[in-house]
Amino acid sequence: MRSGAQSCGSPASSWAEDALLEAFLVSTLVVAIGEIGDKTQLLALILAARFRRPVPIIFGILFATLFNHALAGLLGGWIRAAVAPDVLRWGLGLSFLAIAAWALKPDKMDEEPVAIGKYGAFAVTFVAFFLAEIGDKTQIATVALAARFDSLVAVVAGTTAGMLIADVPAVFLADRASTRIPFKAIRYVAAALFAAMGVAALAI
């Protein structure tokens, strides 16, 4: 007969599951809020208005984000393994505070990132989103989150889910969404969230 300890999950297993869930939920929340009003959300509005084909646009966003954030997450994991804990703590704290300040600045699309040409909605969206995310605050946040949490899969899944939560409604609402979303208020919420994470990292 199996003992109660064997039949129930061990404390270590429960802790690991909680850590994975925390990494996923925090990553989702941070990126979903930070993405609202970001240039990639504006890009989703532009592509949706241009193509009027939401499904390939959404798949383009999904795969571009997975690819881009997986690379960012790998970098964050390497930083976590290579950097001393005290240096990592200060680096993460200051990074989140810097992203908080960055979140207060409105994004805009200065020019068309990818010419439409003969390419389809999926290809244009994939390339445009991948390029737009390079150096963007959500990519930098993914690096920091992957360095903060010891779970690449949970972080990348969370940041990708956050991107979709913010961008999919924009695809379906197209240009009507941009006039109704309180971007300024949401930027302040995003900045406060990043700042709180920065303070928490420094206080550990």
PLM features: what roles do these ranges have?
Residues 131-142, 195-204:
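Hydrophobic alpha-helical transmembrane segments in multi-pass integral membrane proteins
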Residues 25, 29, 119, 123-127:
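Alpha-helical membrane-protein architecture signal
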Residues 22, 52-120, 169-180, 185, ...:
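Membrane helix-loop-helix hairpins that form the core translocation module of multi-pass transporters
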Residues 122-128, 154-159:
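Alpha-helical membrane-embedding segments
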Residues 32, 36, 66-67, 101, ...:
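Hydrophobic/aromatic residues within the transmembrane alpha-helices of Major Facilitator Superfamily
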Residues 15-81, 141-162, 169:
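Juxtamembrane transmembrane-helix termini in multi-pass membrane transport proteins
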